[in-house]
């Protein structure tokens, strides 16, 4: 045994079941940590440790990686990141749906960029400045950051309701190049949203050219997730092919009652594309989604709940149908007078949700909106809901598969080296949970309830969540992508 091997561990988790993030069966073993790394796995009963924790009867897993967040500003404003660490998340991927906090200096960013804003939040003219701020004031979790196409448009174009000119495309491409060179892991788009709805496929391809040279990811909230979802998928695949870069289909779903069941159509299309090019997807475990309040979404949804409303804050948490009735209007016609606002939309079918979650390559991403006054419960409950409700209670897949979908798979697809698995030499991002009791307790009525069954969470070897509370340690780092 070398001198380094004989040194006491800083942390020793003893007697737990290790589910290592590789989608293989769990095994009983001890895990030792030195500094920010996993130092040893096996029978460590005779080893010395500064801190030894008996985790008998509990699962030790890699910290969960939230593949789809809007935590860009929350990482700076609420550095404890309690909605995430309380459910075992140790890394968040930001800059999704075309929305990133940089590069943009803007006092009043257009919707949906305002989903990240708390007033004065858009102050970083370069992506490097944003990453520098994250490094200067680290959060409790790691962050892997993308740059958003809608943010680039807002930075360059005085009028977003048109296609970009060649000069504007070149300016956006320069900003994208700066972001990628500074450490962005990819570029996201959200052509579903007004700021980018007029962007052509060719514009997106040209703005995203820096991805090819930097080995970055192209992630997309597709142009349509309802009636025209097949055309949207084809556009997404084309962009990936022309740039020769990995594609991530964000929060895959089929929206609106007329489209219920169409995951039987979309998943084979995605699987076929995977055989030809690098395609990934993620999903959240709910039949309701949440974003800005939009008239077209209101028509698709069976029920709509207001999550925030700037002109009428008292409407947060109210049902849109009730508000419309009180004002003597249809729910469609009442939307303009409530702007800007956000909403939860019940518009998916449970069999589709289960089919997408059970699809082998599907990663787990919360898509939570942390600045909403009454957020969708996915912000607090996504990961324990997959582990408890879908894996344990419904038996949709084994616990080991559930863990893989939120750890090893995600780390591999996003190129997060040394993360997502329990291996000696890997970073000590860890979650300890009770497989019998882990569960989401956040509901649409009480959306900020903490998960049950999460014992403790470690980020880069430091404890960040113990005894149902933040420990005060801001151990997170800005993560780079290692291209495959």
Swiss-Prot record:
Catalytic activity of the protein: an N-acyl-D-amino acid + H2O = a D-alpha-amino acid + a carboxylate
Record-linked InterPro entries: Amidohydro_3, D-aminoacylase_insert_dom_sf, Metal-dep_hydrolase_composite, Metal_Hydrolase, Metallo-dep_Hydrolases_sf
Protein EC: 3.5.1.81
CDD domains registered for this protein in UniProt: D-aminoacylase
Coiled-coil ranges per UniProt: none
Record field: transmembrane: none
Gene Ontology CC annotation, any one: cytoplasm
Record keywords: Cytoplasm, Hydrolase, Zinc
UniProt-annotated location(s): Cytoplasm
Function: Has a wide specificity; hydrolyzes N-acyl derivative of neutral D-amino acids.
Protein's name in the database: D-aminoacylase
Gene that encodes the chain: dan
